[in-house]
Swiss-Prot record:
Family: Belongs to the COX16 family.
Membrane topology per record: Single-pass membrane protein
GO cellular component: mitochondrial inner membrane
Residue intervals annotated with topology Mitochondrial matrix: 1-6
Protein name: Cytochrome c oxidase assembly protein COX16 homolog, mitochondrial
Organism: Caenorhabditis elegans
Gene Ontology terms describing biological process: mitochondrial cytochrome c oxidase assembly
Intracellular or extracellular location(s): Mitochondrion inner membrane
Length: 115
């Protein structure tokens, strides 16, 4: 009789308890994944607001693919090695060459953004 009682009452009880524990695992996993994504979005918004408050201009719509395309379009075959000045040397030549390169890259970026 006790064996029959276990089959009728105990087995369904254990099946429900263990089955629901297994099923709740998936519901909780969805909750934790959603919380993680939401937290990352909040952190990203906080970072953007801090950067704009500090005066940095952020580009909108920047993706990994767009950055890869920019890097792939760079002319890496024709470049000039510029040695950085030492502490005892004059910085005027270095600053002049550096400014010329920055102006050239700024013009290229403006042309690409206008197209």
């Amino acid at each position: 009789m006790s064996r029959l009682k276990f089959v009728r009452v105990g087995l369904p009880f254990f099946a429900i308890v263990l089955g629901s524990a297994y099923g709740l695992h998936f519901f909780q996993q969805v909750r934790f994944d959603f919380r993680k994504i939401k937290q990352e979005d909040d952190n990203l918004e906080l970072l953007r607001s801090d950067l704009t408050r500090s005066g940095l201009r952020l580009r909108e719509g920047v993706t990994v693919e767009s950055v890869y395309k920019e890097v792939a379009e760079l002319d890496t075959d024709n470049w000039e090695n510029i040695r950085g000045p030492r502490d005892t040397e004059d910085l005027t030549d270095y600053n002049l060459i550096k400014k010329q390169q920055q102006e050239a890259s700024r013009k290229v970026r403006e042309l690409k953004s206008n197209v």
